Design a protein with these regions (language model features):
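Domain-scale signature associated with acetyltransferase and cell-envelope carbohydrate enzymes
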Residues: 28-306
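A periodicity- and composition-biased signal for non-globular, repetitive helical segments
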Residues: 18, 27-28
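Compositionally biased, intrinsically disordered low-complexity segments enriched in Pro/Arg/Gln/His
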Residues: 6, 11-14, 20-23, 36-38, ...
Length: 306
């Protein structure tokens, strides 16, 4: 199994209040560069799903959807934006509570190749979709997901949020202590400094308990009710995405499985997940690329790692 490696700079000091001297570098099963987060309480910037006013489908809209071979478990549980256009939906099965945005624009699926936004050949259950997304050829289903604006999801088998989802947060791993008790907790605010503090002062029980309590409270405070996909995300030719939060401007092309992960992409430093990648119980920092069939489990990949 291949692991992503992070460089954790270990502070050379005896007192936790002494400024760390970043002179010596140790290698562990994590690799991370220094994050721009200011402290462990920095709230993650989840997708900016457009807040809109929804309404029920009209009888004419239901008739148009049915004429396009769409079916719903209960049409009354589908809510749509004011500018909703049913003619851009074909062969879609709706289950549970559905919310749909406006589908008025074209999207660029490849350089110079434009397709109109809409949903075709898909099964949706308890899904919210933002404006101007293109979702097509979902061979399995999308279940319990919130999808932002201007996304492309094509040729995907399953996307799902299940009970007990962790999104890669709260996992306890061993760093520089492979045969002992886990000494490092993965979470969205992890930095080199916080990691070094947890590892170096692992045997300081009061400090360890306090840090773990603060991290646990932060995870509980920021955990979403269901997995979400940000704006301008592109997911193509991917088999399985389960319990995974995907931030803005991320691209996933040909991945085999993403399970209980957080991809902290943004418009200035996007995350790319390539062909054959299997990633489980991990957090990927902004600007990072995971490619060439990497198999990764219980890892934190820092900013701009490749």
């Amino acid at each position: 199994m291949t692991y992503a490696y992070l460089n954790i700079t270990t502070p050379q000091h005896n007192n936790i209040f002494t400024p760390p001297q970043h002179n010596n570098t140790s290698t562990s099963y994590l690799t991370t560069s220094t994050s721009h987060h200011n402290n462990i309480f920095t709230t993650p910037q989840h997708n900016n799903i457009t807040h809109m006013i929804y309404r029920k489908l009209t009888e004419d809209e239901i008739s148009t959807l049915q004429a396009n071979s769409c079916w719903a478990e209960d049409w009354q549980r589908i809510e749509v934006s004011e500018d909703f256009e049913p003619r851009f939906f074909h062969r879609v099965m709706f289950y549970g509570d559905i919310r749909l945005g406006a589908f008025t624009d074209n999207v660029e699926v490849s350089r110079g190749f434009m397709k109109h936004s809409g949903v075709n050949n898909a099964t949706l259950r308890n899904v919210t979709i933002g404006n101007n997304c293109l979702i097509e050829n979902i061979s399995g289903y999308i279940n319990n997901y919130t999808i932002g604006d201007d996304c492309i999801i094509s040729n995907v088998c399953t996307m799902e949020t299940t009970d007990g989802a962790t999104y890669g947060e709260g996992n306890l791993i061993s760093v520089l202590n492979e045969v002992g008790e886990g000494n490092l907790i993965l979470f969205h605010g992890l930095t080199s400094q916080v990691a070094a503090l947890m590892v170096k002062h692992f045997h300081n029980r009061p400090l360890k308990d306090t840090i773990r309590r603060l991290i646990r409270e932060e995870i509980e405070r920021t955990a979403p009710d269901m997995a979400a996909i940000g704006n301008r995300v592109k997911i193509v030719n991917t088999k399985e995405i389960t319990n995974t939060v995907i931030y803005d401007d991320c691209e996933i092309a040909g991945a085999a499985r993403l399970s209980d992960c957080t991809l902290m992409s943004n418009s200035n430093a996007s995350v790319y997940i390539g062909t054959g990648v299997i990633c489980e119980n991990s957090i990927i920092g902004d600007g990072s690329s995971i490619i060439n069939s990497v198999k990764m489990q219980d890892c934190f990949v820092g900013e701009a790692c490749k």
